[in-house]
Structures are given as C-alpha cells and as structure tokens.
Amino acid sequence: MFKQASRLLSRSVAAASSKSVTTRAFSTELPSTLDSTFVEAWKKVAPNMDPPQTPSAFMKPRPSTPSSIPTKLTVNFVLPYTSELTGKEVDMVIIPASTGQMGVLPGHVPTIAELKPGIMSVHEGTDVKKYFLSSGFAFLHANSVADIIAVEAVPLDHIDPSQVQKGLAEFQQKLASATTDLEKAEAQIGVEVHSAINAALSG
C-alpha cells in the first residue's frame, strides 16, 4: 500500500511539473507590445498622471562597427559640471591610464581604462590641447568613439606653477606632521596630486 501511494504521489508531482513548466525561447529583448500595454493600464489607474518611462525607452541599438578604420577619433570629454568636448573629431588622444600613458587612435580596440592623476593631451593636426585630470574613466568603443569621464580637469595652461609649488610644500609639511591615519591619507593624496601637476608642468 505504501509503494502504491508513493507511485501515485510521484505521478501527480510529475504531472504538475509538466503543466507548470512551459518552454519558450530565451530573449533579452522586451516584447514590442509591453510599453503600450503598460501605458493603457497606467491610464486606467491614474488618468491625470503621465506614465513613467519603462526600461525599453532608454535602450538604444549598439552602434555598428565600421567596415574600415575611420580617419578621425570622436571624443566626448565630460566633467560633472560641464561637457568639455562633445563629438569632437581628433587625430589622437593620450590619456593617463592607471597602467601608464595610453595613446588612443581611430580603430582602437574596445577598452575601459581607469584614469589616474596626470595629463591628457588631445591632438588635432598640429594643435595639441592638454588637460590635467584628477581621476576618472575612459570608455573606448569599437566605432572609434572615446567617452572620457573625469572627476576634475583643468587646461594645463590655466595652472599657475608657483601655486602648485606652494601647495606641494604645504601638503609635504602636513604629511610630515600628520598624527592620524586620516591626516596621513589626506596629506598623501595632496602630495601625489601636486607632484603629478608639477611633473606635467615641468615636462
């Protein structure tokens, strides 16, 4: 009797599992009717409010990789408070990656690079524009577009060398007299940043 009950139970579980599991093709794309269905349902509940945007409203197709290497590199250089360069076509950009100076030309392999304090130079013909970057990231895409995001950046020709020397001396003094780990860390950051600026100006 126990064996018969076990067989009946296993059959019922298998039948329930086969009914609950439906096969369908895996897809990361949203159904085309999803947005319209959501909007209609939203209007029934809150007719006086605009419906929020669904994830598909922010989705864009991935840019296609060109069949030939472009002659120019398109650069977008963005800071938290402004866009320094937007869709700027240049010949080359040299960025201060955490692994060392990185030259970026049209057709560069797709890369994400962390930026350290240092000089970024933008080359357009014989014109070279240099910026001091505090930190950030560079996103290099297969379609020869470079998105460079920096926490802070200053054109190199806007920096006063005497103020850099003064700041370096102040932070070196703070580092020597620091008594807590926090004071040491803050002073060390100041020394490293001012040293990088000083090296860029003297180089």
UniProtKB/Swiss-Prot annotation:
Report the subcellular localization.
Mitochondrion; Mitochondrion inner membrane
Q: Give a Pfam family name.
A: ATP-synt_DE_N
Superkingdom assignment: Eukaryota
**Transit peptide endpoints, chain numbering:** 1-26
For molecular function, the Gene Ontology terms on record are: proton-transporting ATP synthase activity, rotational mechanism; zinc ion binding
The UniProt keyword set, sorted, is: ATP synthesis, CF(1), Hydrogen ion transport, Ion transport, Membrane, Mitochondrion, Mitochondrion inner membrane, Transit peptide, Transport
Cellular component, GO annotation: mitochondrial inner membrane; mitochondrion; plastid; proton-transporting ATP synthase complex
User: Is Transport one of the keywords UniProt gives this record?
Assistant: yes
InterPro entries cross-referenced by the UniProt entry: ATP_synth_F1_dsu/esu, ATP_synth_F1_dsu/esu_N, ATPsynth_dsu/esu_N
Does Magnesium appear among the keywords?
no
Chief subcellular location: mitochondrion
Subunit comment for this entry?
A: F-type ATPases have 2 components, CF(1) - the catalytic core - and CF(0) - the membrane proton channel. CF(1) has five subunits: alpha(3), beta(3), gamma(1), delta(1), epsilon(1). CF(0) has three main subunits: a, b and c.
Family, as annotated: Belongs to the ATPase epsilon chain family.
PANTHER family on file: ATP SYNTHASE DELTA/EPSILON CHAIN, ATP SYNTHASE SUBUNIT DELTA', MITOCHONDRIAL
Please give the function described in this protein's UniProt entry.
Mitochondrial membrane ATP synthase (F(1)F(0) ATP synthase or Complex V) produces ATP from ADP in the presence of a proton gradient across the membrane which is generated by electron transport complexes of the respiratory chain. F-type ATPases consist of two structural domains, F(1) - containing the extramembraneous catalytic core, and F(0) - containing the membrane proton channel, linked together by a central stalk and a peripheral stalk. During catalysis, ATP turnover in the catalytic domain of F(1) is coupled via a rotary mechanism of the central stalk subunits to proton translocation.
Q: Which NCBIfam families match?
A: ATP_synt_epsi (TIGR01216)
What protein does this entry describe?
Answer: ATP synthase subunit delta', mitochondrial
Q: What is the lineage of its organism?
A: Eukaryota, Viridiplantae, Streptophyta, Embryophyta, Tracheophyta
